[in-house]
Amino acid sequence: MTEVQSSVIEGWSIESTLPKKSEVEKLAELVPAGTEVYLSTLPHVSLDQQIETAHIVRVNGLEPVLHVAARYFATRTELVGYLARAGRETAAENMLIIGGDADRPNGEFDSALSLIKSGLLSDYGIRRIGVAGYPDGHPKISSDALIEALGAKIETAQAAGIAPHITTQFCFEAAPILAWLKDIRERWPDVPVKIGIAGPTGFKTLLKFAVRCGVNTPRTGIAQKLTMASKIAKTFSPGDLLDDLDTGLGQIGGGNLSAHFFSFGGLEKTATWIAGRLNEKSNFTGTNETQRMQL
């Protein structure tokens, strides 16, 4: 029987878009070597910029995980060149494969699944891939369609000898995450899941990203909740959400769950907060163990 984790912060990763060299160097001082740094892509971010940033992450002893947006590639040749360069300059073995925000595909790849099906990932040394999960749903795609697409991506990757994991959109409440995880664990009990969580961030900044990423929906009522919370504190903190998730882990069972932090408030600020959280957990565990031994 798989041991249940004590906290989702175990094995955490962090995400940014185009962090500066100085920001990456500072991050490397704060976090363990080999920490995964996901590098997101947007329409205004060039492939050159993304790979150059991944190279900086790699030479600083961290593990870059490139977001690869299928719809951004105009030709198969362009994708081949990108994968070859990623392997050559960043030693990439792990990527997050997404469809991308473009309304229309620039070429033959219209979805993450079509790119995974191409067979090019394993040809260029990719051994692990992340695929997107949406515990809070998607504003344009039904829940049934999301699950069907997720299953197809997982099965296609596994058939190609690539180990898949699920990286989710960031969420604000534990209940929908735990309900979604329960369903995922029943379908794919051994597939690792990275739970998207916003790091410490100003409420105005957080709301901007929530709207941009489709997290702010009428059903979730996030805009109203963030507005109310901003009257109590200046900065959003994910501590309560992590506490609620840790409490709910026993209901789901199994391991292979970890937090994936979106560093909307900056890499250094997020990493510093994580270090503090880990220190708190360590002290709490140590205190409980001491008390147990004295009984």
Outline where the language-model segments fall.
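Active-site beta->alpha loop and helix N-cap motifs at the rims of alpha/beta catalytic domains
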Residues: 2-150, 155, 266, 276
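Active-site pocket-lining/capping segments in soluble small-molecule metabolic enzymes
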Residues: 15-20, 98, 111-136, 149, ...
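Glycine- and other small-residue-rich loops at beta-strand/loop junctions that grip anionic moieties
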Residues: 16, 42, 71, 142, ...
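A short acidic (Asp/Glu
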Residues: 49-50, 76-79, 175-182, 206-207, ...
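Conserved, mostly hydrophobic/aromatic
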Residues: 66, 153, 162, 195, ...
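Short, well-ordered secondary-structure micro-motifs
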Residues: 107-108, 141-143, 178-179, 204-212, ...
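Hydrophobic, aromatic-enriched interface-forming segments
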Residues: 140-159, 163-185
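A short, acidic, flexible beta-alpha connecting loop/helix-capping segment that sits on the rim
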Residues: 261-269
